[in-house]
Amino acid sequence: IDFLDHATVLRDYYPDCEAIVREATGAAVVRAFDHNLRSAGGKKAKERIAGGQEVQGPAHVVHGDYTLTSAPQRLRDLARPPKENDTVRGILAEGETLLDADRVERAIESGRFAIINVWRSIADEPVATNPLALCDAERVSPEDLVVFEIHYSDRIGENYFAKASARHGWYFYPAMTRDEALLIKQWDSSGHLARTRGAEPDSAAPGEPCTFSFHSAFQDPATPPDAPDRRSIEVRCAVLYD
């Protein structure tokens, strides 16, 4: 797959990601709706995806992609015809929606929905620079969450930043290859934090699903100075369980 070709990724790679998430979750509906290509060298060189956006650098900030407000709103957005900045404009007919509006409302009001990223290296070499770390959701408290808005030309999104805490525990998968994929839970409406509207942490309900995982690229002190650049792609998938 030519990951620098926008149309090719939507046509050929999105279905692969949907199949991976569907197999992992058993969900009834999985639809990929957005992606980012990341490379420090590509960002510096202002590399651009054919038919799409510029290549982004690794995100060196602890964050979660969605909030109590923006997660359900993003699904509702995907149940409407795509707007100017919606990636799936390239695969939908005029007036077509990615998700069924009635099904989305049922999932939000009384069912279960999630947003899951499929993160993968696309370089020939294993990841050595700017690897991705994920925070244990059971060690995050509601007071650690800081909402920040992202203003697009056609909508306003919300992410979470994290307040630093000695409670946090971090994990990463070293030397990931292009034959491996990491599924990152960006939101799960069945998580305890989500179900209590942010009043209680996921740790208050051990054994239940977590709501989301903070994540960030980081500088590994063990990385050799001549290590190759990380090139990765993440694809966001909307997941409806019912």
PLM regions and their residue ranges:
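Non-heme Fe(II) oxygenase catalytic core, chiefly the N-lobe of the double-stranded beta-helix
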Residues: 1-159
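Catalytic core of Fe(II)/2-oxoglutarate
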Residues: 156-242
